[in-house]
From Swiss-Prot:
Gene designation per UniProt: ndhD
Enzyme class: translocase
Transmembrane regions listed in the UniProt entry: 4-24, 31-51, 87-107, 113-133, 134-154, 167-187, 211-231, 242-262, 274-294, 310-330, 331-351, 385-405, 416-436, 462-482
Pfam families per the UniProt record, alphabetical: Proton_antipo_M (PF00361)
GO molecular function: NADH dehydrogenase (ubiquinone) activity; quinone binding
InterPro entries in alphabetical order: NADH_Q_OxRdtase_chain4, NADH_Q_OxRdtase_chainM/4, NADH_UbQ_OxRdtase, ND/Mrp_TM
Primary residence: plastid
Name by which UniProt lists this protein: NAD(P)H-quinone oxidoreductase chain 4, chloroplastic
GO BP: ATP synthesis coupled electron transport
Reactions this protein catalyses: a plastoquinone + NADH + (n+1) H(+)(in) = a plastoquinol + NAD(+) + n H(+)(out); a plastoquinone + NADPH + (n+1) H(+)(in) = a plastoquinol + NADP(+) + n H(+)(out)
Family: Belongs to the complex I subunit 4 family.
Length: 499
């Protein structure tokens, strides 16, 4: 166990600092905003310090391990650790949450609760990615639900209560299957039950039981990822949530399901994963095309972007199901890439709504002339979303594309069919994104006035978008550094469990 509890500090610091917010002076919102931003920035700097000085790139084992007996009666341990799968997502969480806090600057109604909930989400997300115990993983998974529900129900749009209720019902029901699967794994064929990932890796199950456990976890991840047909909560949630909340949902929350699929299903249940892998590839390919077609029919800007997220997460499913070095590396890169691109698109949709007061694409035409900066940034981020060469999405999707081809266990016919379906999805993506840009910026005038005028992006908004767009370009031009973060872990997982 590591002597200094770095991981415990970064998990508990945000929510602990959030408890101070009720005692801050009540003269306006300025102090609360700056305090929360300072906490998020300090947390991100701590994460960056741990990554730079304590994380070993070539070590595939769990690093900075911490193990404290929390509730001995049920053998509940506070087990934390990081490896290649988790550190990239922890960095993404710190980066996106800090920018989402800055994006929430205009929020003036009940700011104490709003910013506390954001910090509580921060702790839950870091805790989930650092968990090395199924019960702690479940605890952190559940910790996300209440903050998101309240952020949606209190600061959402007109149909916020419907969207919040749908979100909590879907995700809470799905969460139960994590607990069920975890309990079966802990108690099966063991005198002393444990939820420790490192112990459960070496545990063997009959294939039928392993498939049941795998399905139990998969149902929970299917809601969060999301996988069709469990995706219907996502467009409603994104359509009603404040755009800072949307940044956290698209940037981090969806990645929790994909992370669980790799961390638990792929690592702890490899035989069942080999059985289900072709089906994951098939569902992922169908999801890409289905969500792209559905996105094209959406008249609401945020719902269109939400369906594009569902489509892009289909690539992650294919990469995980490919069981190849290229495919799995590409899937993790796609998670990072989509986190940045999705957050930027929802932020742009939000600041566009702040100016036009509408999300209906048919009513947003002709605003490009009065908002050239937003137009330029929106176009650039849309190009990143459609995987333009030189941007992060292109590298990720190309690796996933090649990963399916690289799997020797899939027949040539299967590969050809999947490649054709992926190709259709890749063709549909620019259609719905470019039509969105045309309707917003090139379409008919917003009103009957000669030239509607809206204020363009300010310094704060431009700063947020540059911060998001810079890593998208950097990864697209030179992905080797980012891929090296988790490549050794990917190699170890595949060679140890599948080859």
């Amino acid at each position: 166990m590591n002597h200094f509890p770095w991981l415990t500090i970064i998990v508990l610091f945000p929510i602990s600092a959030g408890l101070v917010i009720p005692f801050l002076p009540s003269t306006g919102n300025k102090i609360i905003r700056w305090y929360t931003l300072g906490v998020c920035l300090l947390e991100f700097l701590l994460i960056t310090y741990i990554f730079c000085y304590h994380y070993q790139f070539n070590d595939h084992l769990i690093q900075l391990k911490e193990d404290y007996n929390w509730i001995s009666f049920i053998n509940f341990h506070w087990r934390l650790g990081i490896d290649g799968f988790s550190i990239g997502l922890i960095l993404l969480t710190g980066f996106i949450t800090t920018l989402a806090t800055l994006a929430a600057w205009p929020v003036t109604r009940n700011p104490r609760l709003f910013y506390f909930l954001m910090l509580a989400m921060y702790s839950g997300q870091i805790g989930l990615f650092a968990s090395q115990d199924i019960l702690l993983f479940f605890f952190m998974w559940e910790l996300e639900l209440l903050p998101v529900y309240l952020l949606l129900a209190m600061w959402g749009g007109k149909r916020r209560l419907y969207a919040a209720t749908k979100f909590i019902l879907y995700t809470a029901a799905g969460s139960l299957f994590i607990l069920i699967g975890g309990l079966i794994m802990a108690f099966y064929n063991s005198n002393e039950f444990t939820f420790d990932f490192q112990f459960l890796i070496n545990k063997k199950y009959p294939l039928e039981l392993e498939i049941i456990i795998y399905l139990s976890f998969l149902i929970a991840y299917a809601v969060k990822l999301p996988i069709i047909p469990f995706h219907t909560w996502l467009p409603d949630t994104h359509g009603e949530a404040h755009y800072s909340t949307c940044m956290l949902l698209a940037g981090i929350l969806l990645k929790m399901g994909a992370y669980g699929l790799i961390r638990i299903n792929m690592e702890l249940l490899p035989h069942a994963h080999s059985f289900f892998a072709p089906w994951l590839v098939i569902v992922g390919a169908i999801q890409i095309v289905y969500a792209a077609l559905t996105s094209l029919s959406q008249r609401n800007l945020k719902r269109r972007i939400a369906y594009s997220s569902v489509s892009h997460m289909g690539f992650v499913l294919i990469g995980i199901g490919s069981i190849t070095n290229l495919g799995l590396n590409g899937a993790i890169l796609q998670m990072i890439s989509h986190g940045l691109i999705g957050a930027s698109l929802f932020f742009l949709a939000g600041i566009s709504y702040d100016r036009t007061r509408t999300l209906v694409l048919d009513q947003m035409g002709g605003i490009g002339n009065s908002m050239p900066k937003i137009f330029t940034l929106f176009t650039s981020c849309s190009m990143a979303s459609l995987a333009l060469p030189g941007m992060s999405g292109f590298i990720a999707e190309l690796m996933i594309f090649l990963g399916v081809i690289d799997n020797p266990n899939y027949s040539s016919l299967f590969k050809i069919i999947i490649i054709i379906i992926q190709g259709i999805g890749i063709i549909l993506t620019p259609i719905y994104l470019l039509s969105m840009l045309r309707q917003m910026f090139y379409g008919y005038k917003f009103s009957n006035t000669l030239e509607p005028y809206f204020m363009d992006a300010g310094p704060r908004e431009i700063f947020i978008l540059i911060c998001l767009f810079f890593p998208i370009i950097s990864i697209g031009i030179y992905p080797n550094f980012v891929l090296s973060i988790w490549n050794s872990k990917v190699n170890f997982l595949l060679s140890n469990n599948f080859f």
